[in-house]
Amino acid sequence: MNIPILVEPNYKERSVWSHLIMGAIDKTVLSKKYTVSEIDPRSYRSMDYDALFQNTPRLLLLIAETYDWMEQALSFFSEIHVDIVLLETDLSGYSCVKGQVTADHKKNIQMLLKLFSDCGCTRTALYGYYANSVPDRAKRFFFEKEMRTGGIESPEQLCFENRSGLADCYNAFYSRISEFDSVICVNGEAAVALAKNLTRDGIRIPEDIQIITFGGTELTATCTPKLTVMGVGGDLIGQQAVLTYRYLYHANTPEITCNVKISGGLFRRDSTRLPDSPAQQNTAEKKMPPTSTTKHRYYDDREVQELSALERFLFSCDPLDHAILQHLVRDISYDEISEILHLSKNAVFYRVKRIKGILGLQTIEELKQFLTANNYC
């Protein structure tokens, strides 16, 4: 069985999650002796799909995040009668969507709000959602639904949108900081940026405000304090993607669909208190956050670019890379590092050069500044 896969270009190039999911798919496919054909996302419209599928079911995996790109892709595949298994997104209304593998956003939001309630926190914000992200839309929908069920009349006032960049999102939130005792961040990039800014402005985490973020890469462990995470592993999504594809492939019946929702796991770190800790009481005025009409694309934001680079860097480094960098950031020379780690000086040099290339940096000093600025030690 061959599995064709199409990945949204920006998501493929800039998101560690896409690499984690693809890695899990490749591992599962290898264990079952299937094959994978990755479709070029820049030219998928001009591909000969009759030649690709021949006499097999017209079915492919689609990994994407942004609503506008996905809408165009699904409209195209509906027209040419190619069925789709969607990963990480819950988007109905298209005849071509026969399967979905996604996080159970409803259950995960309920779990996080229950955790905050057990901690004594009842004034929770949703932070950093990007309106063009299908997963972020789902998180906001279920957050607002749960808050409305809990008696909040205008839950949209508790949601802070990454409308024109994370800096503006933070400014809107900080102007109302005293209204909240807890925050759910939609992803690790938004959470790390929030934690850094709050710490800079003298807001203590978790004493003044508690933070939990969706996500689960090493990025959330780079800030101080380390962030509590609600994670749905990319390995599980990738594995379920292959199993869902196989089921639909062999069923090969238009009436059959298959939707898999995966509950997240909570990784408790330093940004939340134990349930029996008293929550700090605050009072505040109620007002709507400022709005912006600026057209904004998520990965155009400088802060997002820097955090994405950090995330890719952490994903790309092995334990030996980390050992070299930990010495380097302490101003230990190449000669001393090679002696300590029993490596040749050339090996140290080329590993550092590769890491600079990943981060788009030119000099050792730039690398040290990057590591220091991101609390790498």
Segments from the language model and where they lie:
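An alpha-beta-alpha
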Residues: 110-151, 256-274
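Periplasmic-binding protein-like
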Residues: 4-6, 56-65, 83-85, 125-128, ...
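Helix-turn-helix DNA-binding segment
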Residues: 302-347, 372-376
